[in-house]
Amino acid sequence: MASLPDHLRRGMKLIVVGCNPGDRSARVGHYYAGRGNEFWPLLYDAGIVPELLESKDDKRVIEFGVGLTDLVKRATRGAEEIERHEFAEGRILLAQKLEEYAPRVVAFNGKMVYEKFAQCKCKLGLQKKTVYGAHVFVLPSTSGLNATGQGVKRRYFRQLGEFLRRLN
């Protein structure tokens, strides 16, 4: 199954890290293209990007200082299909990307994504730890499969947007 290319540039204000490309995203070749995925409206609502983008516009996030990547690059129908060694390899590769691209903030799209990366439990929101100098923010997963209500997702995305504005 296909994967998605990273959309990254050095010195971005934010890099968003997903778990891995979903089946639909891999088929259409764009991030967060799954039916019911709320990523793009939440990103706009939080003021992180100045216009409402769609998955087909994913490359444009770089214009707004936002990058996209995944912890595991192999597309699957669900995260349960990811092998333990893929998470281990993904941790190493993501650490290298964060060191190389040096974002101000790295946001993990889903608690499980950060927990697999950091190998520790966490709460949603801003974390006390930094990674290669980047502040770490954990968002609720935007997947349509996540039962977390839209109000909770919106609240954390807005907190991230406010945090980014305070950094400027």
Feature names for model-found ranges:
Residues 1-13, 34-35, 42, 78-94, ...:
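C-terminal capping/extension of enzyme domains
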Residues 3-9, 52-61, 97:
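Short amphipathic alpha-helices and their capping/turn segments at secondary-structure boundaries
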Residues 21-24, 74-76, 142-145:
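A short, flexible beta-alpha/helix-coil linker loop
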Residues 25-85:
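Short, surface-exposed acidic-centric catalytic microdomains
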Residues 25-28, 115-119, 148-149:
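Short glycine-/acidic-enriched loop or helix-start segments at secondary-structure transitions
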Residues 63-117:
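Internal catalytic-core helix/loop-beta-alpha segment
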